[in-house]
Amino acid sequence: MSRILDNEIMGDEELVERTLRPQYLREYIGQDKVKDQLQIFIEAAKMRDEALDHVLLFGPPGLGKTTMAFVIANELGVNLKQTSGPVIEKAGDLVAILNELEPGDVLFIDEIHRLPMSVEEVLYSAMEDFYIDIMIGAGEGSRSVHLELPPFTLIGATTRAGMLSNPLRARFGITGHMEYYAHADLTEIVERTADIFEMEITHEAASELALRSRGTPRIANRLLKRVRDFAQIVGNGVIDDVITDKALTMLDVDHEGLDYVDQKILRTMIEMYGGGPVGLGTLSVNIAEERETVEDMYEPYLIQKGFIMRTRSGRMATAKAYEHLGYEYNEK
């Protein structure tokens, strides 16, 4: 069973996100620093009648990297071709995609850190000089074919920017760090979603829901749907702060946006290792989760909220973690 606070896409959420997706930067809520920079770069590229420099968007899942890619294409007035790193298994797959691009088009590669090295190497000349050299045939009869490409913009999205090779990262002229959303922005997103789907919600309820959504629109919209169900069956259909608190408590989402897995991580650190330091591998084994899952899905939010510290010796639970879970904290 998937956890309610998982920031990866579940079920029909891709369709829901497409329905909610803003079309232009002025409609995009939050990520102001990234938006302000992109607005300038896009306008400058349009004035020069050039393709926008390649863009790298990085940050945790669910923060709107795919949405931002579509917004950029709309702002440029060009087509967007969408694919992902795991889908492009060999260089020929990438060549076929590049060959379909029109001048100025956007190629969006999600999970770009998962591109095979053989594919990544083809991208170098395509990104830098808009051409590719490919080998046709095999053995002594093989020959190199030079293909010119129209100017295009590559938008890469990744949750693990550190896994990108230096040569690939260096070819992105624009980088955008997608951060967890501020409470006010997330509240506005919840209210916008409720309005689009004709849900009746109070501002206080939207604010409480945003507070417990881990700074992530995808999670906020998912929780909103579950709270709506609760309001429909237990209440009178109106989503207010009382209904919201009851629903989220039933879903094991506390007032800091932590669920049972987050609390299990913190309790394990405190009860078994005296608050740490404890290695990530050891911690993962103790809570029966994959190391990569803990590192990518749980830890970033716990660090951002000040419940965990990274040290050279390992992870440590903070005084805030002790206080939140009701433990007495003795500073080491």
UniProtKB/Swiss-Prot annotation:
Mg(2+) binds at T66. DNA binds at R291, R310, R312, R315. GO terms for cellular component: cytoplasm; Holliday junction resolvase complex. It is found in: Cytoplasm. Its main location: cytoplasm. Residues 1-181 are annotated as: Large ATPase domain (RuvB-L). Its EC number is 3.6.4.-. One of its GO terms (molecular function) is four-way junction DNA binding. Residues 255-332 are annotated as: Head domain (RuvB-H). Disulfide bonds: none annotated. Residues 182-252 are annotated as: Small ATPAse domain (RuvB-S). One of its GO terms (biological process) is DNA recombination. Pfam families: AAA_lid_4, RuvB_C, RuvB_N. Keywords: ATP-binding, Cytoplasm, DNA damage, DNA recombination, DNA repair, DNA-binding, Hydrolase, Nucleotide-binding. It catalyses: ATP + H2O = ADP + phosphate + H(+). Homohexamer. Forms an RuvA(8)-RuvB(12)-Holliday junction (HJ) complex. HJ DNA is sandwiched between 2 RuvA tetramers; dsDNA enters through RuvA and exits via RuvB. An RuvB hexamer assembles on each DNA strand where it exits the tetramer. Each RuvB hexamer is contacted by two RuvA subunits (via domain III) on 2 adjacent RuvB subunits; this complex drives branch migration. In the full resolvosome a probable DNA-RuvA(4)-RuvB(12)-RuvC(2) complex forms which resolves the HJ. HAMAP family: DNA_HJ_migration_RuvB. Belongs to the RuvB family. PANTHER family: HOLLIDAY JUNCTION BRANCH MIGRATION COMPLEX SUBUNIT RUVB (PTHR42848:SF1), PTHR42848. The RuvA-RuvB-RuvC complex processes Holliday junction (HJ) DNA during genetic recombination and DNA repair, while the RuvA-RuvB complex plays an important role in the rescue of blocked DNA replication forks via replication fork reversal (RFR). RuvA specifically binds to HJ cruciform DNA, conferring on it an open structure. The RuvB hexamer acts as an ATP-dependent pump, pulling dsDNA into and through the RuvAB complex. RuvB forms 2 homohexamers on either side of HJ DNA bound by 1 or 2 RuvA tetramers; 4 subunits per hexamer contact DNA at a time. This is Holliday junction branch migration complex subunit RuvB.
